[in-house]
Swiss-Prot record:
A cellular component term, taken from the record's GO annotations: neuron projection
Entry-linked InterPro entries: AB_hydrolase_fold (IPR029058), Lipase (IPR013818), Lipase_LIPH (IPR016272), Lipase_N (IPR033906), Lipase_panc (IPR002331), PLAT/LH2_dom (IPR001024), PLAT/LH2_dom_sf (IPR036392), TAG_lipase (IPR000734)
Pathway: Glycerolipid metabolism; triacylglycerol degradation; Glycolipid metabolism
Chain positions covered by the region annotation Required for galactolipase activity: 93-105, 257-279
Domain PLAT, residue spans: 357-469
Keywords for this protein: Calcium, Cell projection, Cytoplasmic vesicle, Disulfide bond, Glycoprotein, Hydrolase, Lipid degradation, Lipid metabolism, Membrane, Metal-binding, Secreted, Signal
Residues annotated as the enzyme's active site: S171 (nucleophile), D195 (charge relay system), H282 (charge relay system)
UniProt xrefs under PROSITE patterns: LIPASE_SER, PLAT
Protein name as annotated: Pancreatic lipase-related protein 2
Top-rank lineage group of the source organism: Eukaryota
Carbohydrate attachment residues: N71, N353, N399, N455
Binding residues annotated for Ca(2+), in chain numbering: E206, R209, D211, D214
Length: 469
């Protein structure tokens, strides 16, 4: 992938005509800002709809496993299908060197059917996506125009308004969705950008890339947003939505540091393994979204100016107005989806369903002597127990307090007790004892505080249990 577009961007191109038209989808210019700018020096036209050969594959709750193919220029195929006018319609759009008739797009539809009645349309434009990157960039314009034409037809012929439509696009698919939204004057109900493509889009004018004006609500998940040079990142860095989420800082995702062999020999197959090695962080965006459908509370985004401030605890807990949920339910952030450029940060798990719940833990120490070591806390709640998390490492002094935010991989529910452990891994002939006299735990979402107390002190590596004060 990378050599084709990086080398291609350096090539000189022959000046061509100013536009090409593909009826009934409109005309496409090869003038600025579409080409001839710093990010797009090549003059290219998009391929024709016939060459791209995009397919629109409808899945519904009535046919979750076998699609019904829709002809977007013949709405009789919609009337003859399981498409329901009283349901929301979500389009799922893949990106570069991907396809839409299997894999994550169809899996996304199936998860939606578990929580809602919905028309789910996978847009398979693989013929236009499996080519040189710069050509695929321009091909998105035609597929975007096709989607816009289809949505407009649903509105004029079936009375199905564009506000009922949600476009979900990964990588180039997100920029493709933006083109559809732009052509509809921003009347689409929602666009979700899953790590929108960076090359040929970062820093371009608004009409070229995803922008808040493309839909009534635009939410974005950034997972591979470091700079192209030297990191070869694929996702856009700039804020391009109403709500922009940067999980784990938005640059490198946990669990994406595996070695080459273990990644390529992936349990999901060789091709999936190769994709995960080349673009692991880039792919996490749709994996997070997919998991959020069934785990809505495990992806809470905290409003913050930077990831560094978030990590230092400066943006905890959620403000009085609450925090949005990254992913499928981001539009439930009531009354706060119209302001543009809002940034949110969170940490995720490294595997499994990637969920995480943030807690602030404060520990006040008890004992008679100062020692060096580390202290750890485990939470025990109505929904389950957490593993032990390190709160502090260094000089442990009686009566000193230490506070740290932890990201727990399950929602423990109402915290009922905590367990404290300390160690220094050094032989000490005096067998010092240390304990926690008070532990305070605060949940990030509801801001509830739980207080636990004890008069005990323990030798190292011995668990101390604290109960509500």
């Amino acid at each position: 992938m990378l050599p084709s577009w990086t080398i291609g961007l350096l090539l000189l191109a022959t000046v061509r005509g100013k536009e090409i038209c593909y009826e009934p989808f409109g005309c496409f210019s090869d003038e600025k800002p579409w080409t001839g700018i710093l990010q797009r020096p090549l003059k290219l036209f998009p391929w024709s709809p016939e060459d791209i050969d995009a397919h629109f594959l409808l899945y519904t709750n009535e046919n979750p496993n076998n699609y019904q193919r829709i002809n977007i220029t013949d709405l009789a195929t919609v009337r003859a299908s399981n498409f329901q006018l009283d349901r929301k319609t979500r389009f799922v759009i893949h990106g570069f060197i991907d396809d839409g008739d299997s894999g994550w797009p169809t899996d996304l539809c199936k998860k939606m059917f578990k929580v809602e009645k919905v028309n789910c349309i996978c847009v398979d434009w693989e013929h236009g996506a499996w080519t040189k990157y710069t050509q695929a960039v321009h091909n998105t314009r035609v597929v975007g125009a096709e989607i816009a034409f289809f949505i407009q037809g649903l509105s004029t012929e079936l009375g199905y308004g564009p506000e009922n439509v949600h476009l979900i696009g990964h990588s180039l698919g997100a920029q493709l969705a933006a083109e559809a939204g732009r052509r509809l004057g921003g009347q689409v109900g929602r666009i979700t950008g899953l790590d929108p493509a960076q090359p040929c889009f970062e820093g371009t004018p608004e009409e070229v890339r995803l922008d808040p004006s493309d839909a009534m609500f635009v939410d974005v998940i950034h997972t591979d947003s470091a700079s192209i040079i030297p990191f070869l990142s694929l996702g856009i860095r700039q804020k391009v939505g109403h709500l922009d989420f940067y999980p784990n800082g938005g640059k490198e995702m946990p669990g994406c540091q595996k070695n080459i062999l273990s990644t390529i020999i992936d349990i999901n197959g060789i091709w999936q393994g190769i994709q995960d090695f080349v673009a692991c962080s880039h792919l996490r965006s749709y994996k997070y979204y997919s998991s959020s459908i069934l785990n809505p509370d495990g992806f809470l985004g905290y409003p913050c100016a930077s990831y560094e401030e978030f990590q230092e605890g400066g943006c905890f807990p959620c403000p009085a107005g609450g925090c949005p949920k990254m992913g499928h339910y981001a539009d439930q952030f009531q009354g706060k989806t119209s302001a543009v450029g809002q940034t949110f940060f969170l940490n995720t798990g490294s595997s499994g369903n990637f969920t995480s719940w943030r807690y602030r833990v404060s520990v006040t120490l008890a004992g008679t002597k100062k020692v060096r070591g580390s202290i750890r806390i485990a939470l025990y709640g109505s929904n389950g127990n957490s593993k032990q998390y390190q709160i502090f490492k260094g000089s442990l002094q009686p009566n000193a307090s230490h506070t740290h935010d932890i990201d727990v991989d399950l929602n423990v529910g109402k915290v009922q007790k905590v367990k404290f452990l300390w160690n220094n891994n050094v032989i000490n002939l005096f067998w010092p004892k240390l304990g926690a006299s008070r532990v305070t735990v605060q949940g990030g979402e509801d801001r509830t505080e739980y207080n636990f107390c004890s008069n005990d002190t323990m030798r190292e590596n011995a668990l101390q249990t604290l109960y509500p004060c």
